[in-house]
Amino acid sequence: MRKAGRPVWGGLGARIVKAPRALALLLATVIAATPLTFAQPAAAAVFPDDPADPVRAAEYWLDSLGVRAAWQTTRGAGQTIAIIDTGIGSGPPEFQGAVAGGTDVSGIGSSDGRTPVGVVDSNHGSWVASLAAARGTANGTGMVGVAPEAELLSVSLGFGSSATVPFVEQVANAIRWSVDHGATIINLSFTTNTLAWDPLWDSAFEYAFDNDVVVVVAAGNRGSGTTRVGAPATIPGVLTVAGVDPQGNASVQASTQGYTIGVSAPSENLLGVSADGRIVQWSGTSGAAPIVAGIAALVRSAHPDLDVANVINRLIETARPAAGTDPLLYGAGIVDAAGAITATVPTVTENPMGSLSEWIRVYRRADAGPVPDQTVAPVEIDALPPADAATPARSALLPSRESLIYGTLP
């Protein structure tokens, strides 16, 4: 049985934020006016957009990243985003008609993946999903995701002693299930806070890449006890997303740094739809990743001929300069939805985020093939003295998920 440390949600833990009073009052009014029962909205082929709606007005990234401009071309129709997280709530109207399927890989959730798993972080999957592809409510109001015409898959994960399946196996199973059920983009808003990953993930991520699925991963948060990216954000071929504040500066609390960062997206003052329908404000690269996953869905919808390498390359090549220039913090820059769809970008033959197959060939030497026959006699040396006893390693996950607290507006 494989064992692994508990993950840190992705934002790797959304952190408590103190909302400006005006925004808090505005959202409190919206939340108070939200009914406790959820009606099935009428099906519609077109999603109206009212920028004056208080919730839509608070979604600043729709304009700053060129998402509304991109909607003139596509809203993500024909694409499926798998949210591998704590599960997407089944009640909120923003998700009605958006979730095409789901499953649980933890052994403690529901078979459809729609029952939120976890006590402290059970809303996390719903927050993430709402940024990627929430469909709003009626008449262009309510929270809308970046790709509101894309479909979602809800795959619920569990942790530690509560789950009946080791976390490493859960992730591998979740990726394979998502690929087999039509995902074109997979979003992973969690980290293990370690650079290395279990070999079981090698074949799972290769399976996604071999089946032309874009995998978007949150870089992680400084506030969760780490300053550098950790797996799965270190796996070659994934698109790792760092976080910036509304002004385009690297987020001090909500983004780590590392060579594997591809692009940046907003990670502060984000909104999310909770599993019970409440709208909350939160921060973390857990939110930056699904914004980029949604934009990847827009690109794939507008350019259905592009493979994974060229979707990721288009996002990287059209990224706008950030407030700073350090690629360890920003990657190629801040993702630009409109540019990624309309710009002329030469095609590539290799994924700019690297090749997992090549990494495995070089670094998983145990699987590199048989050892060549000896050509000379080996040299014998004296045996080495006994080694000292190993010192137990400290936990790579700081803090543990139990110490992370999610915040809502007063």
PLM region descriptions:
Residues 2, 25-26, 33-78, 93-94:
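Protease zymogen maturation seam
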Residues 85, 220, 284:
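Active-site glycine-centered loops adjacent to acidic/histidine catalytic or metal-binding residues
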Residues 71-81, 88-101, 115-167, 256-260, ...:
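Subtilisin-like serine protease catalytic core
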Residues 230-301:
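Extracellular S/T/G-rich loop segment that most often corresponds to the catalytic His/Ser-adjacent loop
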Residues 187, 304-408:
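C-terminal subdomain of the subtilisin-like protease fold in secreted/lumenal serine endopeptidases
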Residues 11, 15-33, 406:
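Sec-dependent N-terminal signal peptides
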Residues 157-231, 278-280:
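Substrate-binding/access-modulating region of protease and related hydrolase catalytic domains
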Residues 77-80, 149-151, 180-186, 210-215, ...:
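Loop/turn elements at helix/coil->beta-strand transitions in domains of secreted/extracellular proteins
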